[in-house]
């Protein structure tokens, strides 16, 4: 239970993270709220057992510390907690548990005041997946097993509470969702019981509904929505290095604070010891109607997707789709080693074009092909041919295949013999 509260113990005293502000003179001020457990004038070590069973003759004390840069530390009078609440009921608390809940409430209230009614946190882009249908071996070389959960084919969303107490719900591209009041209402209730600084990362989703329908619901400005918010991660802007397994523990504790939510859910996690176990879970998730699976490096930090950065601590597993498309042109890559390497250009029935990477050609072959293939040779031997393309999914906005790779031509063609 101790791990559900932000902060840490030092010399048997638990201190919440400092809440910092600036004085009128421009100096940094810090406010810290602490909890200690006393028994006959002795400070006891705080244990998880104290959250379920009272210690004889023990009382909990709450106090605050305040200091300004280069100034002395001022310590408040202690507030003593001598008994829990709701005794005899299912939601009864012990002395220690009640003291921590009281301290968290004061901590959150102070944090809101110091942020100010008009001070809003910036949007932090969510962490993006780097690996597709590949699980790095390093994931299994850590002390803690990788984490796997079902991949829902929904709309990515991040939630946080603003300085005025309102809920900000925004997309992967940092666009605010203006509707979804059903979800925001429950988020506001949840934030009454948890650290107000935490960001919740997940997907807007309704099971077995197509992505296009979900996207339409997510972007609607209407107050009502059928969508649910499935949360699979959490993070703090000043603690991005916190490992994934620790974040998952905190996320579980967050959802324990309010268990009567209807539209917000924690995504279930599974630990795996090898790739075969991860692949079996992926197969099971697909049978249940999900898109596939996400694999997380248990010790990986939270790496925001600034500038479309894709984190090497995430992998996505999902079945590939394939179809035939008409080849109409060719081009080259735009940067790095892809510059000068041939790419195929295919066309959809609606005349929209998209680029396809040859899957079975080496870079040396792709360089040679782009250098030697002329428009005349292309028109004579390749234009209008059906190209088999495997891809992850169709874009809900354009219908274009995403992560498209050319497997080969429907009729046997050796493109290297053309040049």
Curated annotation (Swiss-Prot):
Name of the protein described by the UniProt record: DNA ligase
Main location: virion
Misc. comment: Consistent with its intracellular location, ASFV encodes its own replicative DNA polymerase and three base excision repair enzymes: a class II AP endonuclease, the repair polymerase Pol X, and an ATP-dependent DNA ligase.
Annotated spans, NTD: 1-120
One Pfam family named in its UniProt record: DNA_ligase_A_M
Assigned protein family: Belongs to the ATP-dependent DNA ligase family.
Top-level taxon: Viruses
Organism, scientific name: African swine fever virus (isolate Tick/Malawi/Lil 20-1/1983) (ASFV)
Location of the active site: 151 (n6-amp-lysine intermediate)
Binding-site list for ATP: 149, 151, 203, 232, 294, 316
